[in-house]
C-alpha cells in the first residue's frame, strides 16, 4: 500500500513538473512572439503614382494598414512608405530599408522587378516582397494575381450590357500584367458575343488623369458605351469623362479595377462593376508567415478565382439579374478549370469560347503558388 502511494506520488510530481515545463515553454514562445510582433518593421517602396490613386497603390496600402490594425501597429513606426519615381530611387530606398534591418521590404508593382532582383542579390540577409511582379530569388516572395480571370468576368458583364456592341479598353502601359487584363477581358466579351468589337488604347502612363480623359473621349466618340480602365491614376480620367457625358444625357459606363471603384463613378453613377484583386489577402499571408518565422523566399504566389483572390466587386447595384447569373456561372466554371482563361497573345489567339457547365460547383481548399 505504502509502495503504491509512493508510485502515485512520484507520477504526480513528474506530471506536474512536465506540465509546468510545457506551460513555461509556451509562455516563453508567446512572449517571444509578442515581442517580435511589437518591434516588427515593414518598409514599402512605391512608384511615382500617388498612394491614394483610388486603384492599385491604394489597394496595396489599404491591405498593409488592415494587417497593421490586426497587430496594433502604427504607421511610421511599424510600417513606413517611401516613393521612388525612378529605378535609381527604387534601388536607393530598398537598400536603405535593408541596411536598417527592416523585417520585410515591399516593392509595389511590375516596374520594381529589376531593382528588387539587384538589391536582393546584394542584401541576402534581408527579405523582400514584390507585389504584381516576379523576382526569382531565395529571399524574395512574389505576390501575383490571375488578372485575366477577373477581367474575363468583366468582359462577360460588359458584353451583356453594351447597347452599341462597341466596348473599350484603356491600359496604362503594355507590360505583361496589363496585357493579361486585356486578353482576359476580350475573351470574356467574345464568350458572350464574338461580333462585339473591343477597341484598345494605351496611355503609356499610370499617373496622368488628363490622358485617361483624352482616350476615353476618343473611345466614347467612336460609339463605345462601356470602357474597362486598367490605368491607375490615369484611369480616373476615364471616370471624369464618363461622368461628363452622363450629365449631358449620354448613357455610358466604366468598369473599375483592383478595388471597388463604385464611389469613383458618383454622383453620376457610371461604374458598372469593378474587376478586383484581394491584395489584402496576399499581403496579410506573407506578413503573417514572416512573423511566425516561416518566410517562404523563392515562392511565386498566384491568387486566382480558385483561391478567392480575384473576381468582380460585391457591389452589384448596376448589374441586372441575368448578368449576375451569367457572371456567377462563368466564375464557377473557371474555378473548376472547365474554362481556361487566356493570359497572353498566344493563348488568346488559340482561345475558343467554351459553353459553361450548369449546376452548383463546390469550392475546394487549395494551396496558393508554387
Where are these regions (language model features)?
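Bacterial N-terminal signal peptides that target proteins for export
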Residues: 1-9
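Serine/threonine-biased, Pro/acidic-interspersed low-complexity stretches characteristic
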Residues: 9, 22-23
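C-terminal motif of bacterial Sec signal peptides marking the signal peptidase cleavage site
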Residues: 17-21
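A residue-level marker of the well-folded mature domains of exported/periplasmic proteins
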Residues: 24-370
Amino acid at each position: 500500500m505504502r509502495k503504491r502511494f509512493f508510485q502515485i506520488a512520484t507520477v504526480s510530481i513528474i506530471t506536474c513538473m512536465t506540465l509546468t515545463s510545457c506551460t513555461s515553454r509556451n509562455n516563453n514562445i508567446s512572449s517571444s512572439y509578442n515581442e517580435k510582433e511589437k518591434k516588427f518593421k515593414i518598409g514599402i517602396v512605391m512608384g511615382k503614382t500617388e498612394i491614394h490613386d483610388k486603384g492599385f497603390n491604394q489597394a496595396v496600402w489599404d491591405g498593409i494598414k488592415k494587417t497593421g490594425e490586426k497587430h496594433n501597429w502604427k504607421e511610421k513606426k511599424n510600417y513606413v512608405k517611401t516613393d521612388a519615381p525612378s529605378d535609381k530611387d527604387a534601388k536607393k530606398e530598398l537598400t536603405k530599408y535593408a541596411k536598417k534591418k527592416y523585417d520585410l521590404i515591399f516593392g509595389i508593382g511590375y516596374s520594381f522587378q529589376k531593382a528588387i532582383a539587384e538589391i536582393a542579390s546584394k542584401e541576402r540577409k534581408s527579405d523582400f516582397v514584390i507585389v504584381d511582379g516576379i523576382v526569382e530569388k531565395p529571399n524574395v516572395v512574389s505576390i501575383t494575381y490571375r488578372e485575366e480571370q477577373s477581367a474575363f468576368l468583366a468582359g462577360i458583364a460588359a458584353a451583356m450590357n453594351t447597347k452599341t456592341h462597341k466596348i473599350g479598353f484603356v491600359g496604362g502601359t503594355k507590360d505583361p500584367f496589363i496585357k493579361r487584363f486585356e486578353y482576359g477581358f476580350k475573351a470574356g466579351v467574345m464568350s458572350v458575343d464574338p461580333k462585339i468589337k473591343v477597341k484598345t488604347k494605351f496611355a503609356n502612363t499610370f499617373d496622368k488623369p488628363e490622358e485617361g480623359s483624352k482616350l476615353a473621349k476618343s473611345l466614347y466618340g467612336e460609339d463605345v458605351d462601356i470602357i474597362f480602365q486598367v490605368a491607375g491614376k490615369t484611369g480616373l480620367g476615364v471616370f471624369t469623362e464618363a461622368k461628363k457625358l452622363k450629365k449631358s444625357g449620354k448613357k455610358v459606363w466604366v468598369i473599375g479595377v483592383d478595388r471597388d471603384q463604385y464611389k469613383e463613378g458618383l454622383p453620376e453613377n457610371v461604374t458598372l462593376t469593378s474587376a478586383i484583386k484581394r491584395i489584402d489577402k496576399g499581403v496579410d499571408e506573407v506578413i503573417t508567415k514572416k512573423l511566425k518565422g516561416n518566410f517562404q523566399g523563392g515562392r511565386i504566389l498566384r491568387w486566382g478565382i480558385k483561391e478567392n483572390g480575384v473576381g468582380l466587386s460585391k457591389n452589384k447595384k448596376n448589374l441586372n439579374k441575368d448578368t449576375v447569373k451569367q457572371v456567377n456561372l462563368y466564375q464557377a466554371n473557371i474555378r473548376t478549370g472547365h474554362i481556361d482563361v487566356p493570359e497572353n497573345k498566344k493563348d488568346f489567339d488559340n482561345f475558343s469560347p467554351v459553353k459553361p457547365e450548369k449546376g452548383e460547383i463546390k469550392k475546394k481548399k487549395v494551396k496558393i503558388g508554387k
